[in-house]
Amino acid sequence: MRDEIFKEPIKKQFEFDDFVVSVFDDMIGRSVPFYDVSGKLVSEILAKILPAKAHVIDLGCSTATSLLLLNQLRDDLVLEGVDSSSAMIENARKKAKAYGAKIKFSVGDVLESQICQMDAVMMNYTLQFIRPPKRAQLVKSIYDGLNEGGVFVFSEKIIYEDKKFAKNMIEIYENYKEKQGYSRYEIAQKREALENVLIPYTEEENRTLALGAGFKRVESVFKWGNFMTFLAFK
């Protein structure tokens, strides 16, 4: 289903309600540059580095795209997805069933998720929706819940410190979205709806967040404009 949510005037802040869920795959595919490419890259990296029968959890799994990509490469992995939206989880279960993938799904707040003896934790464009005062605590709980040698994979929309450069990058991104079929009105509507809901950090702030939780090193494996994917190793 095509994303046309913001063709009409917005009446509330952005949230992952049933309407958003119904168009989510199209929305993220057209809104996040090279979403499919970066997702496949992460899956290939994890498929190479994870031990046999590794446990992987995706916090904010949405419609399970990342988990399904990983399952296609490594069917020995024990996969789990958590999302606060019951509609997202319902969609994820349907997709997993269609692919014949054995994935455990649950509805829940990622801040309250039990992370224990995991080999990998994924958060794809989810951390940016967590209020800043709670992010450090969440990343620390992820670190604590990973096995030694485990990896935390997180993709984030980022901001730049230099205001002029940041403005240029936003304009480039909005031009990109227009080429994906969104009107300038839709782009402006979504930007307004996301204000104070999606709160991005700089690249350095994201690295500091992970290192401060205890991770020994942080690598970046993908970047396009305001979008990055990090791997933090325990």
Curated annotation (Swiss-Prot):
InterPro entries: CmoA, Methyltransf_25, SAM-dependent_MTases_sf. Its EC number is 2.1.3.-. GO terms for molecular function: carboxyl- or carbamoyltransferase activity; S-adenosyl-L-methionine binding. The keyword DNA-binding does not apply. It is an enzyme of class 2 (transferase). Keywords: S-adenosyl-L-methionine, Transferase. Coiled coil: none annotated. The keyword Transferase applies. One of its GO terms (biological process) is tRNA wobble uridine modification. It catalyses: prephenate + S-adenosyl-L-methionine = carboxy-S-adenosyl-L-methionine + 3-phenylpyruvate + H2O. It comes from the Bacteria. CDD domains: AdoMet_MTases. S-adenosyl-L-methionine binds at residues 35, 60-62, 109-110, 124, 191. Transmembrane segments: none annotated. Homodimer. Catalyzes the conversion of S-adenosyl-L-methionine (SAM) to carboxy-S-adenosyl-L-methionine (Cx-SAM). HAMAP family: Cx_SAM_synthase (MF_01589). Belongs to the class I-like SAM-binding methyltransferase superfamily. Cx-SAM synthase family. This is Carboxy-S-adenosyl-L-methionine synthase. It comes from Campylobacter curvus (strain 525.92). The lineage of its organism: Bacteria, Pseudomonadati, Campylobacterota, Epsilonproteobacteria, Campylobacterales.
